[in-house]
Amino acid sequence: MISPSKKRTILSSKNINQKPRAVVKGNELRSPSKRRSQIDTDYALRRSPIKTIQISKAAQFMLYEETAEERNIAVHRHNEIYNNNNSVSNENNPSQVKENLSPAKICPYERAFLREGGRIALKDLSVDEFKGYIQDPLTDETIPLTLPLGDKKISLPSFITPPRNSKISIFFTSKHQGQNPETKISRSTDDVSEKKVVRKLSFHVYEDE
């Protein structure tokens, strides 16, 4: 079906001197004039109630005068705060000991004393002062570790393997008494000196037959 033909005007040039038609607006879309707004504002101000403020003849404020007792309390409180602040170490005070300061700068007199040979030589710890204990997990019995070893090594029979712990094996040897006179024969670890402490063996030591 062929659509009805619609008449269209031929495109022509537009006259630039022709003014466009002014858009006519209705009265309901017009904004009120400035004069009308000013009249409404003046009318509202004249008709609005105005609150009357009565000026009081009494004094609006009173000067505060500090008494002698209040002055003494204030001075005493100020002195307490000042003394508390002075008692706290000031981190900006150069005379205070700093946390990361070198020990040589903190105690120069003690360092000079160490240079003069005032240090104490190292020695073995006392067994009586530094005691050790072991506890039986079944009976909860606490046994002190007071089993020391002497200067001589303990001779073990050939059928007994010496302890593999390097801290304990230095006190035992597999050589016979005649081959090494510095050793001593022991049937247990109970007959040892009281200078050093080691763990007590759980077996008895017998000589070769």
Curated annotation (Swiss-Prot):
Tell me the keywords, alphabetical order.
Cell cycle, Cell division, Mitosis, Phosphoprotein, Repressor, Transcription, Transcription regulation
Region (Disordered) spans which residues? 1-38
| Up-regulation conditions | Expressed very quickly after G1 release, just prior to initiation of DNA replication.
What CDD domains does the record point to?
A: Acm1_CIR (cd22876)
Q: Which biological process annotations from GO are given for this protein?
A: cell division; negative regulation of protein ubiquitination
Q: From the UniProt record, which GO molecular function terms apply?
A: ubiquitin-protein transferase inhibitor activity
Q: Which GO terms describe its cellular component?
A: cytoplasm; nucleus
Where are residues bearing Phosphothreonine located in the sequence?
161
Q: 4Fe-4S: present as a keyword of the record?
A: no
Top-rank taxon, per record: Eukaryota
Where Phosphoserine occurs, the residues are 48, 202
Q: How does it assemble?
A: Interacts with CDH1, BMH1 and BMH2.
Miscellaneous note, as given in the UniProt record, is: Present with 688 molecules/cell in log phase SD medium.
Protein function: Negative regulator of GDH1, the activator protein that regulates the ubiquitin ligase activity and substrate specificity of the anaphase promoting complex/cyclosome (APC/C), and which is required for exit from mitosis, cytokinesis and formation of prereplicative complexes in G1.
What protein name is recorded for this chain?
APC/C-CDH1 modulator 1
Q: Give the species this sequence originates from.
A: Saccharomyces cerevisiae (strain ATCC 204508 / S288c) (Baker's yeast)
Query: What high-level taxonomic lineage is stated for the organism?
Result: Eukaryota, Fungi, Dikarya, Ascomycota, Saccharomycotina
